[in-house]
């Protein structure tokens, strides 16, 4: 009975801290929406709404790798296979870096085409393109942050994971205000604040390594297709969830643009 009570208490602790952290994580775009609408008006808000689906895709990719890899890590840790846990983390990070560079290349070379595909007209094209390009260039930070958050949480440190997510969100709010209003950086300031948030979050997560609490680390090994394909299905539902919200946003934007235009 005592063991059951302990397991339930631990479960509730992980759940509560994760929910709090995810609420904080959801504030990334919410903060942008508020400050962009106040500082840049209807055109800025339209540009942001058009670009959000791409952010959802990046975030979904990070969650797929993070949740999939961390779940596989927990399974192997429970089986006392500590050598394989390092292989899981290493392959997850390698795959995340590869995916991030694909997003970066698309942002650098195809941001204009993607902006047109999302339905931006002449009035908001420039702002939408700027937001898309910068958010995609920050893809490594978003994806690696998602991976580290999940692994640190499953490594017995859900409190630090939650604190990192909340710190990242709070920094986004502060930087949004600073860049948009104080420094008058416009839409670039909004997306720069959002891109810096996961960097700050990872700095907080680094305490897990600096204090020597980590039970996983990178190791010299090649990418294993077998390992990667055992990780991806575990996190795939998270990608689908983010993609679904992005697709709904694209459909919603197209309907609104057809009926009312940008404003």
Language-model features, listed with the residues they occupy:
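Hydrophobic transmembrane alpha-helices of multi-pass small-molecule transporters
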Residues: 57-60, 172-177, 201-206
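Small-residue-rich hydrophobic transmembrane alpha-helices
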Residues: 47-105, 142-161, 253, 257
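Transmembrane helical elements of multi-pass membrane transporters/channels
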Residues: 13-32, 134, 145, 168, ...
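Alpha-helical transmembrane segments of multi-pass membrane transporters/permeases
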Residues: 96, 151-177, 192-195
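Helix-terminus/linker motif at the lipid-water interface of multi-pass membrane proteins
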Residues: 27-46, 115-122, 178-185, 246-263
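N-terminal transmembrane alpha-helices
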Residues: 3-40, 53-68, 72, 97-104, ...
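Short alpha-helical transmembrane segments in multi-pass integral membrane proteins
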Residues: 1-18, 73-140, 182-236
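Small-residue hotspots at the loop-to-helix junctions and early N-terminal turns
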Residues: 42-53, 128, 132, 191
């Amino acid at each position: 009975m005592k063991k059951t009570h302990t397991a339930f208490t631990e479960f509730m602790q992980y759940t509560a801290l994760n929910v709090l952290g995810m609420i904080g994580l959801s504030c990334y775009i919410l903060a942008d929406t508020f400050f962009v609408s106040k500082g840049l008006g209807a055109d800025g808000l339209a540009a942001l709404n058009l670009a959000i689906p791409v952010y959802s895709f990046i975030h979904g990719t990070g969650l797929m790798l993070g949740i999939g890899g961390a779940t596989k890590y927990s399974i192997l840790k429970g089986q006392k296979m500590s050598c394989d846990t390092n292989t899981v983390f290493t392959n997850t990070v390698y795959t995340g870096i590869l995916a991030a560079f694909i997003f970066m290349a698309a942002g650098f070379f195809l941001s204009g085409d993607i902006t047109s595909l999302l339905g931006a007209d002449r009035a908001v094209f420039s702002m939408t393109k700027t937001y898309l390009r910068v958010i995609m260039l920050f893809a490594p930070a978003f994806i690696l942050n998602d991976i580290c958050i999940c692994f640190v949480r499953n490594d017995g440190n859900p409190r630090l994971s939650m604190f990192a997510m909340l710190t990242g969100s709070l920094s986004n709010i502060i930087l949004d205000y600073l860049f948009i209003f104080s420094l008058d950086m416009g839409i670039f300031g909004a997306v720069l604040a959002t891109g810096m948030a996961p960097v700050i979050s990872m700095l907080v997560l680094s305490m897990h390594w600096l204090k020597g609490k980590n039970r996983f680390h990178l190791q010299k090994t090649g990418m294993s297709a077998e390992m990667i394909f055992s990780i991806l299905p575990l996190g795939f539902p998270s990608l689908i969830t983010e993609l679904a919200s992005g697709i709904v946003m694209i459909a919603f934007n197209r309907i609104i643009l057809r009926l009312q235009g940008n404003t």
